[in-house]
Amino acid sequence: MTKKLTLKRKGKEPEPTNEVAASSEASDNEEEEDLLQAVKDPGEDTTDDEGIDQEYQSDSSEDLEFESDEEGNYLGRKKGDGSSEEEDDDGDEEGEEEDEEEDDSEDGESADDGDEEKPTTSKQNKSEDEPSSSKVSKKTQPPTKDLVKRDPSHPEYHDSDTSDEEDIRNTVGNIPMHWYDEYKHIGYDWDAKKIVKPPQGDQIDEFLRKIEDPNFWRTVKDPQTGQEVLITDEDIALIKRIISGRIPNKDHNEYEPWVEWFTSEVEKMPIKNVPDHKRSFLPSVSEKKRVGRMVHALKMGWMKTTEEVEREKQAKRGPKFYMLWETDTSREHMRRIHDPVSAPKRDLPGHAESYNPPPEYLFDERETKEWLKLKDEPHKRKLHFMPQKFTSLRAVPAYSRYLRERFLRCLDLYLCPRAKRVKLNIDAEYLIPKLPSPRDLQPFPTIESLVYRGHTDLVRSVSVEPKGEYIVSGSDDKTVKIWEIATGRCIRTIETEDVVRCVAWCPNAKLSIIAVATGNRLLLINPKVGDKVLVKKTDDLLAEEPSSDVIESERIKAAVQWATAEPAEQEKGVRVVINHFKPIRQVTWHGRGDYLATVMPEGANRSALIHQLSKRRSQIPFSKSKGLIQCVLFHPVKPCFFVATQHNIRIYDLVKQELVKKLLTNSKWISGMSIHPKGDNLLVSTYDKKMLWFDLDLSTKPYQTMRLHRNAVRSVAFHLRYPLFASGSDDQAVIVSHGMVYNDLLQNPLIVPLKKLQTHEKREDFGVLDVNWHPIQPWIFSTGADCTIRLYT
């Protein structure tokens, strides 16, 4: 239920005529005094702090109605007809300004008329109202001062910075109004009552207002009260001037004429032309006396010259020297050096540097050999010296490296820059990449299952049949042996004239051919194992010599000659012999089984040769030598040819006959390489204990460098079906790793070392010489210097 409070305000009457001015003004004064006495308490002071009477006048004759809830909170104002204050303000905003101007003009005219007739009316009132005591008391009150009419074009506080007298309806102060977003009220009025937020319309109401209300574009919301305020024409003009970059005050003239307070033209006549005084050109008596006193002081020695004063200051300063190193107790800021960083101190000597160290600190034969082996890499040594033992201190000789170590220490002090760095507290486990557990990456070989014994010298190479039933091995004992994988039995042994450097089984399952590199000859052998139909088909293919209409150049004839094997060799299974002019080191097959390539490191620009089996002809792909070729490889999908020199790997397009890419290994010597079955990743082994993984689509530099071995890595191999690769090294270890290559090009390969298989024996610093995967099963074969071939499953 709402309460209503009605306060009637006295309206302005029509302007009185001259005849009745006195009577009308008298009656008006009496009515105003009665109304003020009704509102004010008896004896209440009507003056403000400065002693000026305050008059409360109303500018409307209408009734004011205020609404409040049961708690007394202010809700709004209504007119006499029951309409809310908001509805009345929206409809009459435009007419209020005109009404105020008319009211002001009427008030001014009525006040002027009243002043003119004031003496007459005061006399009449005094004579008529003498019997009334109440009226006499009213007349005895001090007369109220007339209100000065203010120009509406100039605000009341136009020339003042004060804001204490502003019309503030919400007393919360200058705070963010969004603090009241969750409340029903928006603040408190002067009576400490809540100001309820006005009703908010929805988007439909706002859309209708945009269409129907012509003043919608100039209506803003007051954040203090939540009411909507209509922007006047003066405010719009001010906003436009600010947006256009002009001075907000339109009465200000920024192009006023310049007033020259002092002329810029040189005047001919001086401002003052007073003749010089006589004392301006006569010697000064005071200066004469001062000079006399100074001369007397110099004679008596009381006063010193500038040179003497400078010498005394120099003597007080002392020599310009400073400490090279700071003391332990004070921190000295040296000249031209801001906050220097002290040099690191040498480590204190330990027990190993004693002239009579304990026996456990002395090197044994193995430690001495390792210490001497790191001569080229002294930073990897645990100690920069070799501990020695003496019977007494007088038996200790002079340290031969003392001067060199002092010299290197001095170089470190003045050549190596020193800086302060904030130590980062980073957990070491955070830096380690999260790798899956090896148990989740099975299957992979974990144990040694079979050992194939039969060779009497180094077994340099091993190759597996495409169906995975047999393997072939080549050794320095000049024999080629064919083994059955399941039983470990040697089925056939083929003797050769020279050391067998490399063997390779043809990857085409429709042919049964083994390429054997022995000395200067490349032998194509039919092993006569497996399917008899396949063996017979292979013999028929190799027995036919195709007709060749192409005339080979003398350069090719001098490098290679094709020939049919002798009858004695035919019995061993040799069908075709390809003679080279230099020893062959490596032989590799193309994926289709028709092409094979050989490498002769001593052949200069003819080191690499490509042979075609079906046409029995050879070709030299390179006319110039780009380095000492170590090994070659065919791309499994594209017509590309990989050539590895000592330091780099070049990829050539055989169709376009151009260089496609050059891979930078940053290694001392490349030993071998293997390509992923998909052809996008390459694995390279080096003699400097590294394995390099190249992503051919990513960069010409290694994607990852793996240092898993302690000695030279001699061979690497990818599995054809499983995401596995392996490496063999001279440390007698075969390390099996997981290498998953994803079809998503945005995802990097996953490389996880899985198992270290170390069962080979070391002979003459050689360990594992070759590794090769089973084509179907996750098994791996390794050959070593211990004359054995080992199978890990």
Swiss-Prot record:
- Gene Ontology terms for molecular function: ribonucleoprotein complex binding
**Segments annotated as WD repeats:** 454-495, 497-535, 579-621, 624-662, 665-704, 708-747, 763-793
Key words, A-Z: Nucleus, Repeat, Ribosome biogenesis, rRNA processing, WD repeat
Q: Where is the composition biased (Acidic residues)?
A: 44-53, 60-72, 83-116
Q: What is its main location?
A: nucleus
PROSITE patterns, alphabetized: WD_REPEATS_1, WD_REPEATS_2, WD_REPEATS_REGION
Does Protease count among this protein's keywords? no
**SMART domains, per database record:** BOP1NT, WD40
Quote a single Gene Ontology cellular component term. preribosome, large subunit precursor
Q: Which InterPro entries match?
A: BOP1/Erb1, BOP1_N_dom, WD40/YVTN_repeat-like_dom_sf, WD40_repeat_CS, WD40_repeat_dom_sf, WD40_rpt
According to its UniProt entry, what is the function of this protein? Answer: Required for maturation of ribosomal RNAs and formation of the large ribosomal subunit.
Q: State what protein this is by name.
A: Ribosome biogenesis protein BOP1 homolog
> What organism, scientifically named, is this protein from?
Drosophila ananassae
